[in-house]
A protein has these predicted regions:
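Amphipathic, Lys/Arg-enriched alpha-helical "gate/interface" segment within cytosolic domains
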Residues: 1-140
Length: 140
């Protein structure tokens, strides 16, 4: 993970950043329940992940607390196809604090399958532990 690029990037309702622990973070901020993540925004998010990971294997922690809305079918297909072909995302940890978002993530993962392991958490600290454990497993 030596090539891991530090920095942050913001696109619309999403901010991506890295920390010294090697985790790539994403915080989505959307308070509009009728807003859908579209194909263009999903493309920008994927570009941010590629740039900040510097094509090195990293865990992705996605903070969806207090987020509303959903995603378009086109965006969902793009994300699932891209994650299936993205060898540098080793796992996804979702942090949620509402039943509706938890169900949305579970439905997305069931319908748009990827090979990347994922887990849902209520706290950032639990998600970080999961990410670090998955990283350690790969280094063994």
């Amino acid at each position: 993970m030596e090539k891991f690029r530090k920095g942050s990037t913001t696109y619309g309702n999403a901010t991506f950043w890295t920390q010294d622990n090697g985790i790539l973070y994403c915080k989505l901020r959307n308070l509009q329940p009728d807003l859908k993540l579209d194909y263009k925004s999903a493309s920008l998010y994927l570009d941010a992940i590629r740039k900040l990971s510097a094509d090195e294997p990293v865990p992705l922690l996605i903070d969806l607390r207090d987020t509303k809305g959903t995603f378009s079918n086109d965006a969902a297909h793009l994300l699932s196809d891209s994650f299936s072909n993205m060898p540098f995302v080793i796992c996804e940890a979702y942090v949620v604090n509402s039943l509706s978002v938890k169900l949305l993530v579970q439905a997305y993962k069931r319908i748009y399958k990827t090979n990347i392991p994922y887990a849902l958490f209520n706290r950032i600290s639990e998600a970080e532990t999961y990410c670090l454990e998955r990283t350690a497993e790969l280094c063994q």
